[in-house]
Amino acid sequence: MSQSGKNGLTYSDAGVDIDAGNLMVEKIKPAVRSTRRPGADGEIGGFGGLFDLKAAGFTDPVLVAANDGVGTKLKIAIDADYHDTVGIDLVAMCVNDLVVQGAEPLFFLDYFATGKLDPDQGAAIVSGIAAGCRESGCALIGGETAEMPGMYSDGDYDLAGFAVGAAERGQLLPAGDIAEGDVILGLSSSGVHSNGFSLVRKIVSLSGLEWSAPAPFADGKKLGEALLTPTRIYVKPLLKAIRETGALKALAHITGGGFPENIPRVLPKHLAAEIDLAAIKVPAVFSWLAKTGGVEAHEMLRTFNCGVGMIVVVSAENATKVTEALTAEGETVFPLGRMVAREDGAHGTIYKGTLGL
């Protein structure tokens, strides 16, 4: 008779290792502490995370919340056994959605679910989450690690993130004064970011390349490593530009659905965004995906960011000032288009020129 048979079944016999969970918590504590900021200086492990809005400097705040995941980009991380950066993606997808509304990210919580917990793997993931929190200035105040035998295939896991930010009342974006003739600025992306990876994986499968093969579009990198380049976090440069110039009218985070799905979300119904596709310096990864998969330009534009991770709407007279403010903070900024009148029933995004794939 087995030991468990003599003494009765244990949770471990069912596939849940509480000791592994406790070990992971100890491993991640230094990373979590590194995200402390005014308003959040507690320890993880309580029943809930705490945040003090007054200590963060707000007087009459409106809270803004967002949640998101990393999608099937995680499958590449799992197959390539490289888990250090997907946590950055998780934070980026949430906090970039906050800043487009003019909100400063304040705190973040994560949900990490797996069939069999590997404390080292989990710690690598949370270290990435902490790095994203530091980069965006928000505190990692809690999370959930769920070990669920039978729910996931061996080695698989999923991530979800939850972020809360704030802006003073009356300072939310879009500002409500977007007008015909306003300029659209593009901010360069770092790569594919965290959308469209089911199509990416399909194209890689058709190519016959392994994740460990040299990346055809990135010298000196393996394919998996190059595709796992973390999503760019735009928070601090945008917040600084918002506060210093007071000239940003609207922002749009270019995620799933690309330009046609994301830009109209921040526009009034009588205006459309005219995008000059020739203005985009398309990163090599998108050219490779399009050519290898035979993906047409219109499909690329509604699936990927194609090199533009964020757009900014400003008046024509403020375009130079905002460009200089963002460039000074390390962003690559370029004129992308302008606001034009929209006819009844017309789409909110209009293209001119050709995408240089």
UniProtKB/Swiss-Prot annotation:
Catalytically driven reaction(s): 2-formamido-N(1)-(5-O-phospho-beta-D-ribosyl)acetamidine + ATP = 5-amino-1-(5-phospho-beta-D-ribosyl)imidazole + ADP + phosphate + H(+)
Class in the EC hierarchy, top level: ligase
Annotated GO MF terms: ATP binding; phosphoribosylamine-glycine ligase activity; phosphoribosylformylglycinamidine cyclo-ligase activity
InterPro entries xref list: PurM-like_C_dom, PurM-like_C_sf, PurM-like_N, PurM-like_N_sf, PurM_cligase
Pathway assigned in UniProt: Purine metabolism; IMP biosynthesis via de novo pathway; 5-amino-1-(5-phospho-D-ribosyl)imidazole from N(2)-formyl-N(1)-(5-phospho-D-ribosyl)glycinamide: step 2/2
Keywords: ATP-binding, Cytoplasm, Ligase, Nucleotide-binding, Purine biosynthesis
CDD domains according to UniProt: PurM (cd02196)
Protein's UniProt keywords contain Amino-acid biosynthesis: no
Any single GO BP term: adenine biosynthetic process
Compartments, record wording: Cytoplasm
A Pfam family of this chain: AIRS
Cellular compartments per GO CC: cytosol
Gene3D superfamilies xrefs: PurM-like C-terminal domain, PurM-like, N-terminal domain
EC number: 6.3.3.1
Family classification: Belongs to the AIR synthase family.
NCBIfam families: purM
Name listed for the protein in its UniProt record: Phosphoribosylformylglycinamidine cyclo-ligase
Species of the source: Agrobacterium fabrum (strain C58 / ATCC 33970) (Agrobacterium tumefaciens (strain C58))
